[in-house]
Amino acid sequence: MKVLILNAGSSSQKSCLYEIPDDALLSEAPQPLWEGKVNWTQDRSVAEIEVKTARGETLHESIYGDSRQAHVTYMLYTLSRGATKVIGQLSEIDVVGHRVVHGGQNYRHSVIITEEVKQAIAKLSNLAPAHNPAALEGIEAIEKSLGDVPQVAVFDTGFHATLPDAAAIYPGPFEWVEQGIRRYGFHGISHQYCSARAAQILGRDLASLRIITCHLGNGCSLAAIKNGRSIDTTMGFTPLDGLMMGSRSGAIDPGIIVHLMRQSDYSAERLDYVLNKASGLRGISGVSSDLPQVIEAITQGNYRAQLAWDMYVHRLRSGIGSMLASLGGLDVLVFTAGVGEKSAGIRQAACEAFGFLGLKLDPEKNQNKPVDIDIATADSTVRVLVIHTQEDWAIAQQCWHLLKR
């Protein structure tokens, strides 16, 4: 089975092609036959197309003009044309899987995409304005290029549909619940994959483990996982809640918003920009939303950069502590995504606060660019894993299961 994956972002569209045996799923993620990416510069009419294959062929082109959908269509054509050709024709693709950030209350599981599903994704765009419209662009590009090939939507919110009401419902008026205002949680595809991968690496039954997964990238979230299910998470109604992030504030006193909106120069649009684009590491440090650049500024004696680091660590530790309380204990702590996988300093700073649990980090393993391994000492009572998140492979697995039903 040939499975094409599209992973839409606000300024990029990533894609890859897997070949999966029809009779059984592989236990670990295979190397994709082909990987493509469209990056849009601030001038949305310019697209940087990057393609590589498992054989080592590469393509890098800049395309001017046309629509974003046309840019995605062009990227897809490189699957069956030119130096990066890996299939004879696009019709060889059996199914296309899409990461869709927000599925709302109605989409708890992966589904075959229909007109009704597309309309629901569009309707939920106000809750994920940077991602749901981009996912629709990818869906429509596939319809144009591949016709009636089955398409599957895999929702980032789906894994958190198991949250108990006490964790999911906000303590506002009950009318909010009736309006669908609740904690949805995000990064669910990553949290689910990493929890299953952790159990696989440790040779343990997933259902027997109490796991906290730390997805730390430009966006950051934690999940508390028990019996293989999400029972608590830090992101909420939108991906703005929870931890301090690259450019997002995370959780703040809502009274601050009321206070600012009473000032005539703070519109809803300005608040949306400030909280999503000008806060977090960027807002506090004044340097960047990128942690390595903040760390570089710290080495130069930048006070605000040091403050940003200290706040980031404080809120990460507090978040892990709250997830710990929801679980009633901890067997496995997982770090994943750009910061989680690459920053030994963040892992060390986070783990130092939980020595009282008997958690002991192996300094050498932590510093040695770990991938899919346990970096705790042999006598640590909590296993600490660094896992390379494989969202695309997780989506491909769900496509395989859905078509095999």
From Swiss-Prot:
The active site is at D156. GO terms for molecular function: acetate kinase activity; ATP binding; magnesium ion binding. Its EC number is 2.7.2.1. Substrate binds at R99. Mg(2+) binds at N7, E391. One of its GO terms (cellular component) is cytoplasm. One of its GO terms (biological process) is acetate metabolic process. Its cofactor is Mg(2+); Mn(2+). It is found in: Cytoplasm. InterPro entries: Ac/propionate_kinase, Aliphatic_acid_kin_short-chain, Aliphatic_acid_kinase_CS, ATPase_NBD. ATP binds at K14, H215, L216, G217, N218, G219. Pathway: Metabolic intermediate biosynthesis; acetyl-CoA biosynthesis; acetyl-CoA from acetate: step 1/2. It catalyses: acetate + ATP = acetyl phosphate + ADP. Coiled coil: none annotated. Its main location: cytoplasm. Keywords: ATP-binding, Cytoplasm, Kinase, Magnesium, Metal-binding, Nucleotide-binding, Transferase. Mg(2+). Can also accept Mn(2+). The record marks H187, R248 as: Transition state stabilizer. It is an enzyme of class 2 (transferase). Belongs to the acetokinase family. Catalyzes the formation of acetyl phosphate from acetate and ATP. Can also catalyze the reverse reaction. Homodimer. This is Acetate kinase. It comes from Nostoc sp. (strain PCC 7120 / SAG 25.82 / UTEX 2576). The gene is ackA.
